């Protein structure tokens, strides 16, 4: 019997690669995205394209407005998205508890459909400032999942996978290309326009562009005219 996996899918480069990895491992993939009040809808449109291209059995977009809380440059217009390169400490683009919220939604869906594997694109190399992208976080969440669910308590354990957590962006891109990922479908920019074109200057754009250079692969990203 084919095993089912829930894959968190933002529409960006990392999550697209993880979806391809889960599929390559033989999982029947269920993609989960969240409309949480992010600055633009382009990444969700990208998520739809990626889910279709990579054969997700289902793709659900859940609405949960984190703009009501703010606390991040991605959900609060009063905070600017940095364009001067990564700095020390936790970046202002960190969305409070976002991975925990999304993994919890994925956990609920997994238990409902009989899946026991959760995949997400945490990366501790390029995004080392995010507390919910560390290996110890992944291990802790897996422990929680097995303490907080009927399936886990009954011994039908959940597994949380973060397959790109120790990979550089260049390594991620090369792995994705080997698995057939079309990165022109993805949007990574924190402030993409309505057409999905990247700003070219935010930290996410900088890291993405450098990743394609490191991978020795042409960058398919569409940039805004001023980028």
Swiss-Prot record:
Key words of the record: ATP-binding, Ligase, Metal-binding, Nucleotide-binding, Queuosine biosynthesis, Zinc
This enzyme's EC code(s): 6.3.4.20
Origin superkingdom: Bacteria
Pfam family, one: QueC
Disulfide pairings: none
Residue intervals passing through the bilayer: none
Cofactor: Zn(2+)
An example molecular function term from Gene Ontology annotations: ligase activity, forming carbon-nitrogen bonds
Gene3D superfamilies named among the record's database cross-references: HUPs
CDD domains: QueC-like
Positions with a binding annotation for Zn(2+): 189, 199, 202, 205
Catalytic activity: 7-carboxy-7-deazaguanine + NH4(+) + ATP = 7-cyano-7-deazaguanine + ADP + phosphate + H2O + H(+)
Keyword Oxidoreductase: no
Signal peptide: none
InterPro entries: QueC (IPR018317), Rossmann-like_a/b/a_fold (IPR014729)
Cofactor binding, per record: Binds 1 zinc ion per subunit.
Matching SUPFAM superfamilies: Adenine nucleotide alpha hydrolases-like
Single biological process term from Gene Ontology: queuosine biosynthetic process
Binding-site list for ATP: 9-19
Pathway(s) this gene product operates in, as recorded in its UniProt entry: Purine metabolism; 7-cyano-7-deazaguanine biosynthesis
Main function: Catalyzes the ATP-dependent conversion of 7-carboxy-7-deazaguanine (CDG) to 7-cyano-7-deazaguanine (preQ(0)).
Protein family according to the UniProt entry: Belongs to the QueC family.
Annotated HAMAP family: QueC
Name of this chain's protein: 7-cyano-7-deazaguanine synthase
Organism, scientific name: Cupriavidus taiwanensis (strain DSM 17343 / BCRC 17206 / CCUG 44338 / CIP 107171 / LMG 19424 / R1) (Ralstonia taiwanensis (strain LMG 19424))
Organism classification: Bacteria, Pseudomonadati, Pseudomonadota, Betaproteobacteria, Burkholderiales
């Amino acid at each position: 019997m084919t095993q089912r996996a829930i894959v968190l899918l933002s529409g960006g480069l990392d999550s697209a690669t993880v979806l391809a990895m889960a599929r390559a491992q033989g999982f029947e993939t269920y993609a989960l995205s969240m409309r949480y009040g992010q600055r633009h809808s382009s990444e969700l449109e990208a998520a739809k394209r990626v889910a279709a291209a990579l054969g997700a059995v289902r793709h659900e977009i859940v609405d949960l407005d984190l703009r009501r809380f703010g606390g991040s440059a991605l959900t609060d217009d009063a905070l600017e998205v940095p364009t001067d390169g990564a700095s020390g400490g936790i970046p202002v683009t960190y969305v409070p508890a976002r991975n925990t919220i999304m993994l919890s939604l994925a956990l609920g869906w997994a238990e409902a459909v009989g899946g026991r594997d959760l995949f997400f694109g945490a990366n501790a190399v390029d995004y080392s400032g995010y507390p919910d992208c560390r290996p110890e976080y992944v291990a802790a969440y897996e422990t929680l999942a097995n303490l907080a669910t009927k399936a886990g308590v009954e011994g039908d354990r959940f597994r949380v996978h973060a397959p790109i957590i120790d990979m550089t962006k260049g390594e991620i891109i090369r792995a994705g290309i080997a698995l057939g990922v079309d990165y022109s479908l993805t949007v990574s920019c924190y402030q993409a326009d309505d057409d999905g074109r990247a700003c070219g200057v935010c930290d996410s754009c900088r890291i993405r562009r450098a990743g394609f250079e490191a991978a020795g692969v042409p960058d398919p990203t569409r940039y805004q005219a001023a980028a």
